[in-house]
Amino acid sequence: MRHLALFMLAATAIISGPVVAKDTLARNKEVARSFFEDVLDKGKLEDYAKSHAPDFIAHSEGQPASLEEDMAAAREQRKALPDMRVKVNHIVAEGDHVSVYWTASGTNTAAGWGMPATGKSVSLNGMTLFRFERGLIQEEWSVFNMYSILKQLGLLPTKG
């Protein structure tokens, strides 16, 4: 009977996966929040790499992007929307993942993303899922509605 109890305890530990300490969850959430609030919202792009692993990969739209490519995309975004604001609406952590529901807004006053400046404002909601390793963001998946962005900027064909 004792062996059965030990076996059941071991099986439960294996099935439930790795246990992540509450302080690790809180620390990962804080890194994610700081990335959104300090780097993206306040435009401190020079601090971008402080929260990311050197071999970070972004799996968002299109092909996977390296840290350098993701940082270049953020610079291009900030160029196109220099007054961009980013707000963290909700943040959840489980295991080695942190999910952030966010809102971004800004005015398109300069060319960027291969599009002309429109002078129009844009607002959008999105979700980003981060995977952490050793306290740094290792991977990222972001989703948002690009159609809505193009529509708000007046860059979609109108019905004729």
For every predicted segment, state its role.
Residues 5-15:
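Bacterial N-terminal signal peptides
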